[in-house]
């Protein structure tokens, strides 16, 4: 029995032009009408996640900042230890000094990680972090839009487990959908992990279902079948 559907946005329920795929939205809203909450899991900020959920009509829990922040109803939970947050800020300052990297947002908008522009090779960022002794606690995740400096102790999958504990949901009853490497832990933690055809090879290896079509086109087909199963 499906108790929750949680999905990434870009490359998952969007089209090639990054506009939301209307069939995906329609099917997800129909699932909600049948009592199955729909949530968002993103590398973006909680502010963005809440706005997107409101615009799309999703009423379920939210995973933001790659699992660093979780929102269940009106409760906001930071999953990252304070010492890791301080270390990430320190690492960013060193990267800015040594490589000239820049934040993608003003300071303070992200609570648990730092997102930087992809102006230098990710290997250079990792080399500096390793040389400074940060690589044991901080990792760099390339979402395709930015490099995210984040704690190794959290990811979207661990964020999902926090949600399941709060809501009393068995993770095996969760459907998770995503395409990027930062979605891999989410799909692994869920009972059913679904990846569109454009997903990275790492995500495809982890997914229980790999769709034939890319982006929202493939996900819409899956959601239609899921809706049919719920109605059966």
UniProtKB/Swiss-Prot annotation:
Similarity comment: family membership: Belongs to the archaeal SPP-like hydrolase family.
Residue sites binding Mg(2+) per the record: 8, 10, 179, 183
Name under which the protein is recorded: Phosphoglycolate phosphatase
UniProt-annotated catalytic positions: 8 (nucleophile)
Cofactor names: Mg(2+)
Entry superkingdom: Archaea
One GO CC term, this protein: cytosol
Pfam families: Hydrolase_3
Catalytic activity: 2-phosphoglycolate + H2O = glycolate + phosphate
Role played: Catalyzes the dephosphorylation of 2-phosphoglycolate.
InterPro entries: HAD-like_sf, HAD-SF_hydro_IIB, HAD_sf, PGPase
UniProt EC number: 3.1.3.18
GO molecular function list: magnesium ion binding; phosphoglycolate phosphatase activity
Keyword annotations from UniProtKB, A to Z: Carbohydrate metabolism, Hydrolase, Magnesium, Metal-binding
Binding site for substrate: 156
């Amino acid at each position: 029995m499906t108790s929750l559907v949680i999905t990434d946005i870009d490359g998952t329920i969007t089209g090639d032009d990054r506009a939301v795929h209307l069939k995906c939205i329609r099917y997800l809203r129909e699932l909600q009408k049948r009592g199955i909450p729909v949530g968002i899991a993103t590398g973006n900020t909680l502010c963005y996640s809440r706005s997107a959920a409101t615009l799309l009509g999703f009423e379920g829990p939210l995973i933001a900042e790659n699992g660093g922040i979780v929102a269940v109803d009106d409760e906001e939970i930071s999953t990252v230890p304070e010492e890791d947050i301080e270390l990430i800020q320190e690492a960013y300052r060193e990267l800015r000094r040594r490589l000239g990297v820049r934040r993608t947002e003003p300071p303070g908008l992200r609570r648990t990680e730092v997102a930087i522009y992809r102006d230098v090779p990710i290997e250079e960022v990792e080399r500096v972090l390793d040389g400074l002794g940060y690589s044991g606690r901080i990792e760099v995740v390339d979402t395709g839009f930015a490099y995210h400096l984040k704690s190794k102790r959290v990811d979207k999958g661990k964020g999902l487990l926090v949600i399941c504990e709060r809501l009393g949901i068995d993770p095996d009853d969760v459907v998770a959908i995503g395409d990027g490497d930062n979605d891999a832990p989410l799909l692994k933690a869920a009972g059913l992990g679904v990846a569109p055809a454009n997903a990275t090879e790492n995500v495809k290896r982890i997914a229980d279902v790999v769709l034939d079509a890319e982006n929202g086109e493939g996900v819409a087909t899956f959601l239609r079948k899921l809706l049919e199963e719920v109605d059966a």
